[in-house]
Amino acid sequence: MSRLTRILPLLLATSAFVIPAANAESPKMKMTTPVPPGIATPDKLETRLGTLSSFDGVPDKATAQKVYDNLDFQRGVQAYLNSIQIASMYGMRKGILEFGPANTTALLFETLMDSKALWLTPNTTSVYMTSWLELKDEPMVIETPPNVLGIIDDHYFKYVADFGNAGPDKGKGGKFLILPPGYKGDVPDGYHVARTKTYGNWVIWRGFQEDGDPKPAVDRTKKLFRMYPLSQKDNPPKMNFINVSGKFNNTIHRMDYGIFEEINEVVQAEPTDAEDAELLGLLASIGIEKGKPFKPDARMKKILTEAADVGAATVRTLAARPREDKYYFYPGEGVWTTPFPGGSHEFLEGGARVLDARSFFHFYATGITPAMTAKLVGKGSQYAVAYVDSTGEAFDGGKTYKVTLPKDVPAKDFWSFTLYDNQTRAMLQTDQQFPGLDNNKKGLKQNADGSFDVYFGPEAPKGHEANWIQTVPGKGWNMLLRLYGPLAPWFDKSWRPGDPELVK
């Protein structure tokens, strides 16, 4: 009797080694050795996919089909979550170009942005202006106005440059030269130079009201803002400035199967080296590949349709109910969250990409710049999001809620609340043109102890009309608290806003 034969009962009894079913029925050969645990896969596996059957490591046909359906579904969901920023930029480009061609069209919200504009979580106080930059073989010049916060992001939603107050022009305005992908030509002096990896690029800038008036910022843009090819610097084409305040303007991507078609449009338009090879590989695995038509068959379209549904529910969960403490300003003690928990505009933490943070941010907001990571006392802005009340229940537009801001709100410039539609993440559309308020609002009541009570509901509470923002019965909503010029008590958390409370 061989040594293996003598010890086999002991091995089986102690489960020290796994002998696949097929091998157990096979004759013991001269070269047979024990198989260390964890290497062999049992011929029958009970999983969330059901029973997976194999013959000594080779799945049967039914199992193979089941596994491939699952693999395609998994990759569809991950492609959705990891590419939502690409679809978002597709939506932005489409929304801008509906008003006119790239490079010569600028959209201006001359009397501010209201809820007719479907943009991701804008505010109601900045003077928004935007254009789409399309490069070809030569550099493009952008002449920028002073005193703005401006960003250029590429077609894959990656940072290209800042201009204005956070840019190299230091808020004075200037000439920027944007070099196209692969450009190796001369670069003239006299420009702030930036290189982009994509042909399509989003240009967005925010001006500031002066004594409550947006007109000075608008006038400076009309006078100074230009985009043109470098070869036309001596005779640049005229810009077409379009006032889109009060007009319907959709820049938001789809959340259903159509999101994959939107992502495909960007992949087809841009160089392959403009995006991470791993992500492009993930997209290729579901049929989105540069130079090839995206035409999933009936089976694959059904799988991707379900993947989009699960992806949509997943990213909405990431935004509304984050599960990690780092998304909460007061973990375990309050509902206020941040859509940007890290210190990197590339969503890096400890050398790793924080995937949920990237998905959450690009689902909820827009605009990428290193400046967003700055936490400067008395400068910039800070944002706190609430999707649920103090008990963890989603906001119901048919009910009334209250948020109390304790005295000495730590905002050097001003503070504001804005309400957003859970579905679109754009401003909530009500009878109020601007679904928000700030501390500069006329008639805003302050309590005797210096605190403020702000109300949210379908009807104004009697005596608190100036402190009220309207909601819509039958609809949910979420809110953003913004602090402009945030002060030290915000950062050290010695001051904190009250949680939204249901008013009974």
Model-found features: residue ranges?
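Bacterial N-terminal signal peptides that target proteins for export
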Residues: 1-9
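Residue-level detector of alpha-helical transmembrane segments in integral membrane proteins
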Residues: 2, 13, 27-29
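Absolute N-terminal positional cue centered near the fourth residue
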Residues: 4-5, 14, 92
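A compositional/structural signature for long, glycine/proline-rich flexible linkers
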Residues: 24-504
